[in-house]
């Protein structure tokens, strides 16, 4: 009766058209129509996984976590209330917008709107047709992917996501931010995906550092790298992470939030033990962020 996966994310952005082009033509997502939930995008048999709404924050607006059924939803609502968290039951209008049977809404300790739901819409009768050459995305029991939450107090956030929401610690990377500055990054799982959430006290203005999509082949990563690189949006070169062993690159979205696009992450099972890493990558992942930021700012200049 616990959270099974990250089911969907919604972004509030100042340039919806730029996001539409980026998600479909660069990353290979499928357009799934425009509703009062925003512009919707698919990566699998679900009716939608990412929503993009008009807004000025240029950031993650909400995230939805999936439970198995109504009993699981009620259990999570009770657990949140017992922890002193304000919980609202989503009305029929919100459930229709999200395409789910039932949901609750609340916020994490630092104000990120979160939802827990069950009964998401499946559209097997409408085959997934990628917007660019992608053989497929890895979802299923592992869910949509992950995001890295930026918070001022990682201990407080970690306690909330583990003690209240039930995530489990996979490992920790001590990120060296400068000669005398190290920030621990906590990687959490709720299924066999190595991490569905990471938490770090990064001094960034956004709610998240990046979100991640995992694809089916190394060629999917390579072709997407070339498409994104053609517009100068790469923020980190190809590399392989020390903790989940994913081969990936990072790129800037039109809002400045980054996306990680990767392949072949290892999974956690009952034999998994928590470890600590001193470096985020075995090789690669060299920063070229300044170049990408210049390209993003150029795109945002009025014509």
From Swiss-Prot:
Renumbered residue ranges of the record's region Disordered: 283-303
UniProt keyword Iron, yes or no: yes
Pfam entry (one): BphC_D1
Compositional bias per record (Basic and acidic residues), positions renumbered to this chain: 287-303
Gene Ontology process terms (BP): xenobiotic catabolic process
Gene Ontology MF annotations: biphenyl-2,3-diol 1,2-dioxygenase activity; ferrous iron binding
Reaction(s) catalysed (UniProt annotation): biphenyl-2,3-diol + O2 = 2-hydroxy-6-oxo-6-phenylhexa-2,4-dienoate + H(+)
Uppermost EC category: oxidoreductase
The entry's keywords: Aromatic hydrocarbons catabolism, Dioxygenase, Iron, Metal-binding, Oxidoreductase, Repeat
EC id: 1.13.11.39
Chain sites annotated for binding Fe cation: 146, 210, 260
Known pathway: Xenobiotic degradation; biphenyl degradation; 2-hydroxy-2,4-pentadienoate and benzoate from biphenyl: step 3/4
Subunit structure: Homooctamer.
Family the entry assigns: Belongs to the extradiol ring-cleavage dioxygenase family.
Record protein name field: Biphenyl-2,3-diol 1,2-dioxygenase
Naturally occurring in which organism (per UniProt): Metapseudomonas furukawaii
